[in-house]
From Swiss-Prot:
This is SsrA-binding protein. Pfam families: SmpB. It comes from Rickettsia montanensis. PANTHER family: SSRA-BINDING PROTEIN (PTHR30308:SF2), TMRNA-BINDING COMPONENT OF TRANS-TRANSLATION TAGGING COMPLEX (PTHR30308). One of its GO terms (biological process) is trans-translation. The gene is smpB.
Amino acid sequence: MTEYKKVIAQNKKALFNYFIEERLEAGIVLKGSEVQSLRQGKASIEESHAADTGHEVFLYNCHIAEYEKANRFNHATRRPRKLLLHTKEIKKIIGRIRIKGYTLVALSMYFNKKNKVKVELGIAKGKKLRDKRESIKEKNWKRDQSRLIRQK
């Protein structure tokens, strides 16, 4: 059975720029105005990444637009947001991203079936230029294949 996910934002560039080796789910600490803005779908995680600060993991560069109906207590749009993970998961992540070349990238943000905001993270390794070219060639070849099959 597939799990219910109402996707708020996706990072499609991450799949092109990185090799995703492992995926994991994390909760995120938000303010009330941020949740209301997310319900309207006003978020972007294109350039966002996560990093550790000792025993905690934070999401950086995630843009959540200000909620128009909030008064003066609105939130900062690009503030660092704490990710909610178990201690074992944090230690595992820190061990993996301390290796040279690995980073923690936000892949998607969504509401789960209990209406909690979750972030899907990926432990990723950056692609070189030649790898990106190969993935473009593969994508074009698959598109051409599907055209040929449809024509027959």
